[in-house]
Amino acid sequence: MQTIEQQIANVIEESLTDMGFELVLVKFKGVNPKVVEILIDSLNSEKISVEDCTKASRTISAILDVEDLIEAAYSLEVASSGLERPLVKFENYNRFLEREVKITLKELLNGKTRYQGKIIKAENNKIYLKCEEQEVLIDYDLIKNANLVLTEEVFKKLLKQ
């Protein structure tokens, strides 16, 4: 059975894609009222603006009203996934090749549960990271969570835009 987050993702993802956005993450926060937080990114590597979030929010709100997936009162928050965005799908790793990433694992790998390094490649459900001077091979199914890291190199590129 799918979680409510997965159900929401299923009903909004296609509309967001049609609008030029990638659905990054759906999560619930708070208790009464619940907050449905939705993180989006641009499919064409453009920055996400406040106007983009507003457009996406209106579309998502209309869909959720029709689908009626959430029983209790809730508040909807749509935001950019940010510079240190989470990587939640395997395809994300190929999109961000050569970028620095922090990964937390569900269990120990070589005596560690946390790795930070550059993504070298992602194939066959494996992530190849360059951590310091060694290459680490991580099975995608072992990943608990992963986020991009804002490095000086990325920051300088942003300043040039």
Curated annotation (Swiss-Prot):
Keywords: Cytoplasm, Ribosome biogenesis
Subcellular location per the Swiss-Prot or TrEMBL entry: Cytoplasm
GO BP terms in the entry: ribosomal small subunit assembly; translation
Coiled coil residues, start to end: none
CDD domains: YlxS_C (cd01734)
Name of the protein this chain belongs to: Ribosome maturation factor RimP
A Pfam family per the record: DUF150_C
Protein family per UniProt: Belongs to the RimP family.
UniProt keyword Acyltransferase, yes or no: no
UniProt keyword annotation of Cytoplasm present: yes
Gene that this sequence comes from: rimP
InterPro entries: Ribosome_maturation_RimP (IPR003728), RimP_C (IPR028998), RimP_C_sf (IPR036847), RimP_N (IPR028989), RimP_N_sf (IPR035956)
UniProt xrefs under Gene3D superfamilies: Ribosome maturation factor RimP, C-terminal domain (2.30.30.180), RimP-like superfamily, N-terminal (3.30.300.70)
GO cellular component: cytosol
Function statement: Required for maturation of 30S ribosomal subunits.
